């Protein structure tokens, strides 16, 4: 597999397509990141105060610009999740390799954001199945980690289906703030 920061791969199944995010995704993504019911499921740990609530086209465009810049700088990759039956973008997946002084050093961090109507175990499992098998090779990581709040019951079921296990270890941000609620897959 080529370097993910030189050529972003696409992944697909009968229902879903994961492809690199594009500026033209803004209108669809506004429905995701402007969805107040989806907001509690977004992982904004260590994101400098951004809570990922983008309720205007201007804010959504600004976020996408940052995602594209971050890819160019090799900070993280952001895939759009396309529902093939509607040809609509229903969310994103962000991944990167974390280098740190804590238990999450050399972990592939997986952030999965979908609209609230897609926050269902079976849907999340289908989407995760497209990227998880490739994650270790793409990011040369020793484990995957994803945040699952205690109220995210459907998300927890999807993660358990892959063998993710809840950990009590804290992810420590660059400013020393510690975050809990992570699940690990090795």
Map each language-model feature to its residues.
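GNAT-family acyltransferases
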Residues: 1-117, 134, 138, 150-154, ...
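Conserved acetyl-CoA-binding loop-helix of GNAT-fold acetyltransferases
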Residues: 121-134, 161
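Conserved hydrophobic beta-strand within the GNAT/NAT acetyltransferase core sheet
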Residues: 143-148
């Amino acid at each position: 597999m080529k370097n993910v920061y030189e050529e972003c791969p696409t992944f697909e199944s009968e229902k879903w397509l994961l492809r690199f995010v594009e500026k033209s995704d803004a209108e669809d993504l506004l429905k995701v990141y402007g969805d107040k019911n989806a907001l509690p499921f977004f992982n904004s740990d260590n994101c400098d105060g951004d809570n990922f609530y983008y309720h205007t086209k201007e804010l959504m465009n600004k976020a996408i610009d940052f995602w594209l810049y971050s890819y160019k700088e090799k900070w993280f990759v952001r895939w759009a999740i396309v529902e093939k039956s509607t040809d609509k973008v229903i969310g994103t997946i962000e991944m990167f390799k974390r280098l740190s002084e804590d238990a999450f050093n050399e972990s592939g961090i997986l952030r999965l954001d979908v609209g609230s109507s897609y926050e269902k175990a079976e849907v999340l499992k289908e989407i995760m199945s497209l990227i998880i098998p490739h994650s270790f090779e793409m990011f040369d990581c020793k484990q995957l980690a994803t945040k699952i709040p205690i109220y995210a019951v459907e998300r927890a079921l999807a993660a358990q289906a892959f063998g993710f296990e809840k950990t009590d270890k804290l992810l420590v941000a660059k400013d020393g703030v510690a975050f809990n609620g992570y699940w690990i897959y090795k």
